[in-house]
């Protein structure tokens, strides 16, 4: 799972943090820690459990070197998944009659320190790189030069459901907007995570005519991640999918984020303003912080260079055609990400095998395909999607959502399989997004069939719903869900142990006490959900008034 998605549960990071591309090295593991070593007792596994384990043994082996998107090892893993889809009797649904959909990627990073200056009363004050500001790479242009007056817009959030419009009373057309990082802690988890992201804030700004943004660090930001650490990471590459001209796709529609200003940089920006930076910084510590937007007596000039490195990877896509002539044109998507974070670190063991994240999700996807084929095609078609570059920012799923290999209007639901922690016998399950649409009753029936309870989100403040591949379908208006084993009984301790000890580390391998029979239960629940959706008399719709269903104009219950 993408680092931002879960690391927040156990270590505090800024909401706008982005997973970085891991450097590739040539080191391999010593034989004593090979992930192929058995981790559980010698008791024979059921055929279903053995099948799941066999997939994970291959995908999480040292030979796959962490399955980093763009690597040759990832390509081998993709061919393996394609062969398994073929063996399950699925039809190819990728490019050119094959199982693969090529995903053009581009890695980008700032080229040099850039330049930022503040002009006030005819005098220009240059800001200091690493002390006052860190520039932001622009995936759409090699050279970004902007100069415009600055308007402060609080958090930069527009959320009528919270009585908040941080743009009320100010005109930002042709201006650069400055907003404090994050979002008010009083907001609820899933919506807070979405509203607090830099991409969402840039979208609000662009819709109102702004031409650029800058993010302001607050004392809370500094406590979560010191600005010096942000500056240290500025040389790391980020990634997105590439446009035909080689530039990168951006969600926010092209408006550039210019820089992040430190506490000292923000203080310099607010010299001469009606409201002092000290007052704003103090207000930002409140759970429901409120700011008065204002035009600052300052023009900000920015010059930032961005370097680009092209790469390629692929999604793996297969189809089981539906059996009902009237409903077969509608498609239920089952998805899981195939990539992991590759090879990095200074220890002897540098290979991040990604057994639970997310080789076991891919194994579950393959086994669900085999079960569909065994039990017969449902009324609707089912598309099986193994995506690349989830760890880089949900990129493969975003590419598919924008370049679907089936008509976009035909996709009616998504069920996503991402990092089920299966090191214990689970007593409950959590369905992220399950209460937002008419998928809810379907999910409840499937979970009950496993003899476990359906529990509410145990960590709502982390906004997990917006942080995995299914959210790319949500952004297209498609009702979506993904499930985790819950935290009842031994679950809480097992999840906390995995997150603190093995998550995004080389120890996420087959030396863990993975309960393979629990994988069979996990597959069964998700299969029942997908089968029920595909055989239902009507397509799922968003519950009336749901925030994300309304925001992304999805089908809504009356």
Regions found by a protein language model. Give the residues of each.
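Sec-dependent N-terminal signal peptides
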Residues: 1-20
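N-terminal hydrophobic or amphipathic helices/low-complexity stretches enriched
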Residues: 20-94, 265, 329, 558
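Second-shell loop/turn segments in exported
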Residues: 38-46, 62-72, 87, 102-104, ...
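Noncatalytic luminal/extracellular "stalk/propeptide" segments of secretory-pathway proteins
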Residues: 54, 65-184, 295-296, 308, ...
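Soluble metallo-hydrolase cores and metallopeptidase-like ectodomains found primarily
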Residues: 119-121, 129-169, 250-354, 367-370, ...
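Extracellular/luminal Protease-associated
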Residues: 127-249, 321, 329, 350-353, ...
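Metal-dependent peptidase/peptidase-like ectodomains
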Residues: 142-143, 168, 242-279, 377, ...
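His/Asp/Glu-rich mid-to-C-terminal helical/loop segments that flank catalytic regions of hydrolases
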Residues: 370, 374, 484, 490-553, ...
């Amino acid at each position: 799972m993408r680092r931002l998605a879960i690391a927040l549960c156990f270590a505090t990071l800024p909401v706008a943090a982005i997973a970085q591309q891991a450097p590739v090295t040539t080191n391999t593991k010593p034989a004593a820690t090979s992930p192929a070593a058995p981790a559980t007792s010698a008791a024979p596994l059921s055929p279903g459990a053995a099948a799941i384990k066999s997939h994970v043994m291959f995908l999480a082996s040292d030979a796959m070197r962490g399955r980093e998107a763009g690597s040759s090892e990832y390509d081998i893993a993709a061919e393996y998944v394609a062969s398994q889809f073929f063996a399950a009797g699925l039809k190819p649904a990728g490019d050119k009659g094959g199982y693969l959909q090529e995903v053009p990627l581009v890695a980008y990073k700032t080229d040099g320190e850039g330049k930022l200056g503040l002009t006030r009363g005819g005098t220009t004050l240059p800001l200091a790189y690493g002390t006052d500001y860190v520039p932001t790479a622009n995936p759409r242009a090699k050279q970004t030069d902007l100069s415009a007056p600055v308007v402060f817009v609080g958090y930069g959030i527009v959320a009528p459901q919270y009585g908040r419009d941080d743009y009320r009373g100010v005109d930002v057309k042709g201006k650069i907007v400055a907003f404090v990082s994050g979002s008010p802690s009083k907001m609820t988890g899933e919506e807070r995570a979405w509203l607090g992201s830099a991409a969402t804030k840039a979208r609000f700004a662009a819709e109102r005519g702004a031409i650029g943004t800058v993010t302001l660090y607050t004392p809370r930001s500094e406590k979560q991640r010191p600005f010096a650490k942000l500056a240290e990471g500025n040389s790391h590459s980020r990634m997105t999918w590439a446009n035909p001209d080689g530039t990168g796709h951006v969600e926010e529609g092209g408006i550039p984020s210019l820089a992040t200003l430190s506490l000292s940089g923000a203080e310099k920006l607010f010299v001469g303003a009606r409201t002092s930076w000290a007052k704003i910084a103090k207000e930002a510590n409140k759970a429901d912080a409120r700011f008065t937007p204002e035009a600052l007596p300052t023009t900000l000039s920015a010059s930032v260079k961005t370097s680009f490195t092209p790469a390629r990877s692929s999604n793996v896509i297969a189809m089981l055609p539906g059996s009902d002539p009237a409903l077969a044109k509608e498609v239920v998507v089952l998805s899981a990400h195939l990539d992991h974070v590759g090879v990095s670190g200074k220890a002897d063991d540098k290979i991040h095998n990604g057994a639970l994240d997310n080789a076991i999700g891919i194994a579950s996807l393959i086994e669900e395909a085999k079960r569909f084929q065994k039990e017969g095609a449902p009324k609707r078609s089912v598309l099986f999607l193994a995506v690349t570059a989830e760890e880089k920012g949900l990129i493969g799923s975003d590419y598919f959502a924008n370049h679907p290999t089936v008509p976009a209007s035909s996709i009616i639901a998504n069920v996503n399989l991402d990092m089920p922690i299966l090191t214990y016998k689970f007593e409950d399950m959590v369905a992220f997004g399950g209460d937002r649409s008419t998928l809810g009753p379907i999910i409840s029936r499937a979970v009950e069939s496993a003899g476990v309870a359906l529990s509410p989100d145990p960590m709502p403040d982390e906004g997990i719903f917006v942080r995995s591949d299914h959210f790319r379908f949500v952004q297209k208006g498609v009702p979506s869900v993904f499930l985790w084993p819950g935290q009842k009984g031994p679950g809480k301790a097992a999840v906390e142990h995995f997150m603190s000890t093995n998550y995004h580390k080389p120890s996420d391998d087959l030396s863990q006490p993975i309960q393979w029979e629990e994988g069979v239960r996990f597959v069964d629940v998700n299969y029942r959900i997908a089968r029920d959706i595909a055989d239902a008399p009507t397509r799922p719709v968003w519950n009336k008034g749901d925030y994300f269903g309304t925001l992304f104009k999805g089908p809504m219950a009356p």
